Amino acid sequence: MNLIHTIYQPSGEGPFPTILTLHGRGSNAMDLLGLAPLLCGGKFLMICPQGPLETPIGPGMTGYAWYPMSMGGPPDVDAILSSRRELEDFIERCLASYPIDRKKLALLGFSQGGVMSYSLALTHPGRFAALAVLSSWLPKELEARLKVSDAVQALPTLIQHGTQDPMIEVDRARDSVQRLRQLKLPLTFREYEMAHEITPGSLRDLSAWLEEKVLKTRCSS
């Protein structure tokens, strides 16, 4: 594999409905793996790749990122697209290596991972059964560089954001939603009284949404 990653595999025999889960800046491949047993009773296979770039997160501490921090300037779109190419290769390797139900492959991204998820899903919407973006936004500079497929109009999309988010203000998510609706994505947008995080309430909503849009059968979270 070209990217370090962790995996949660349900009991039983596959192929399994699968979530490709992309972490935020400063985190690692373990960060979101704990969501797997909490989503629809652990029925999803979850694959969590690690961003290819090391980034300092404190004295003597290192995390990982998908692209460099812009320090208030526009995002480095070239770096985003470079990491997207790595993810495209990673997905192909995963499809060849793990018991993935290709018709039930969902994409989930948190924060910087959400930016990467937009880049992947808007370009290759037919590859994914659903897109969930948490505490993130779609940079205009990135959107301008994407060749957005008309197939996005059939991609169920969930966006969750905290009204108290100090890192990515909710207005950035709202602006992204407006632009995504112009692309005619079938989109659900939910705001929560939370910061830059996932809460029990937002997790319950995410689980129910994945059940409806991907599993199509009753499951418990």
Give the role of each language-model region.
Residues 1-100:
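Serine-hydrolase catalytic machinery in alpha/beta-hydrolase-like enzymes
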Residues 23-25, 108-110, 162:
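Conserved alpha/beta-hydrolase "nucleophile elbow" surrounding the catalytic nucleophile
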Residues 38-41, 148-154:
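Short, conserved loop/helix-junction motifs that constitute active-site signature segments
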Residues 152-157, 183-185:
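Short, proline-enriched alpha-helix->beta-strand connector loops that line the catalytic pocket
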